[in-house]
Amino acid sequence: MNRNIFRAANVVGGGTGLSRLLGLVREILMAWMFGTSLAKSAFDVAFLIPNLFRRLFGEGALSAAFVPVFTETLEHDGLDGANRLAGKIGTLLATILFLSVCVGYVVMVFVQNTFEIGEKATAVLSLLRVMLPYLFFICLVALSMGMLNSLRHFAIPALTPVLLNVVWISALIWICPHLGDTLEQKIQGVAMAVLFAGGVQLLVQLPVLLKKGLRPTFSFDWQDSRVRRVLLMMGPAALGMGIFQINVVIDKILAFYVGDWAPAALNYAERLIYLPLGLVATALGTVLLPTFSSYAARNEPHLIRETLGSALRYVLFIMVPATVGLIVLAQPIVDLIYHLPGKRFDALSTLQ
């Protein structure tokens, strides 16, 4: 594998690794404070909605479509052309997200005033009301991260997710214990921390964008051929990712029918799976997308083939043993990480 790619993957992997490590600390604290309670399960279900938009309009489908076109524009038209494209896409994305948040609040008010909803739905909606604007921030963060990655600036985008975990952990330690005696009151502090972290993540990106010469401005010229290309390329990716993410949402909702504990238990297990995935596959994919886009813009398909082959061998070398280890050692790993004696995550939670 190209040394520059490997070095960049290590930078992204290091930032992702730190984020995943802090994310694991965050989940340990969540298990310590909330266990597999209804409050924790309601939070996990409510947090799915901003994450769904992040996957579709942020680091998922939009980034997969935007980064290649943005990289090509950089190669051919320089920063001026890239700024114009980023301004048009950013304006379109911000408009969609703002309208989505408004519609979301209208739907929540309609549901609560029209239907008789139970304790679980009430708990989910109370948290979603707080966290819904997070999708606006995090999708714009993902767009700015895509621009920086296209300029081969990987450090700040890789470290930006760390801020979410830092704010989240800080809230668990210093804010949530003082919000009341019930878990429902304490979990509201986590929801507010998530929203605050989204704003912080966006603000951190701005100075780096300006330093790199990226100064996109609002533009409603969405008839641009490159904007249309981004949207056309986004369609298949959004369809594929959308189906997967909707399945994730359905999984968590169906888990509620198993028991109040089930969505929380499912989320704790997913955190362990995503740890090696984020360290290797996600980090490498983040670096490879702008690299492949640059090769394609320069009409160098042989470099794409060589790099892809090396990347696949590297991923398999790491992920196959990690997968086997998680399967064979599932119970002792969960028990070691999450089971803190005397708190809400007990032996039954481990089995769940």
Positions of the model-derived regions?
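Membrane-embedded alpha-helical bundles of multi-pass transporters/translocases
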Residues: 1-352
